[in-house]
Amino acid sequence: MDGLSFVDKGKIPDGYKNEIDQLVKKEFANIKREPVHPEIRGILAKRKGADNSVSTLTNALYTEYLKQRNNKKRRTPDFNDDDDTLFLEEYRRKYPRIDTSRYIPNESSEVSLLGIVDSYLKHQEIVLDTLLPQTVSNQWRINNDYIRQTCTIVEEMNIQQRKQINDLEIYRKRL
């Protein structure tokens, strides 16, 4: 971090700079960094297949489970009659990327938290749908340029080594 020359009359002591660097590193280490979401490939492939996005979750999902609840043939021995629990179980089955284990049914704050997570993931999908196509072509250009440069370097090394081998063969014949 640098000082402002028009505010700071003297040089900032190195101790302060080091302390700021340590605080920044400490805060950066505390940030929970997660790898790329495991279903990004699925989101990208979604354009070609059926729409399985979170936005397709409608009241039909909830009513479907109300119907299943009343279907005694489909009930299991440990069947839970709570509509909200059924809804969360179906949500968990259809959208495994959302961890619903921390949500407690019948509490409005927890349901709103699920809505927040749902909105956040929808935002991620929108960003991937709109921004990724713009950046992928640039990434391929950079990758192709890198591969061309690497191929040129390898070819030059190959030519140089062949020349050295030929020189060595000529030297051996002279001996």
Swiss-Prot record:
Disulfide cross-links: none
Statement: the UniProt record of this protein carries the keyword Nucleus: yes
GO biological process, one term: mRNA splicing, via spliceosome
Keyword Cytoplasm included in the entry's annotation: no
Top-level taxon of origin: Eukaryota
Keywords of the record: mRNA processing, mRNA splicing, Nucleus, Spliceosome
Subcellular location field: Nucleus
Any one GO CC term of the record: U2-type catalytic step 1 spliceosome
Function comment: Involved in pre-mRNA splicing by stabilizing the NTC (or PRP19-associated complex). As a component of the NTC complex, associates to the spliceosome to mediate conformational rearrangement or to stabilize the structure of the spliceosome after U4 snRNA dissociation, which leads to spliceosome maturation.
Additional detail: Present with 721 molecules/cell in log phase SD medium.
Subunit details: Belongs to the NTC complex (or PRP19-associated complex), composed of at least CEF1, CLF1, ISY1, NTC20, SNT309, SYF1, SYF2, and PRP19.
Identification of the protein by name: Pre-mRNA-splicing factor SNT309
Lineage of the organism: Eukaryota, Fungi, Dikarya, Ascomycota, Saccharomycotina
Gene (UniProt): SNT309
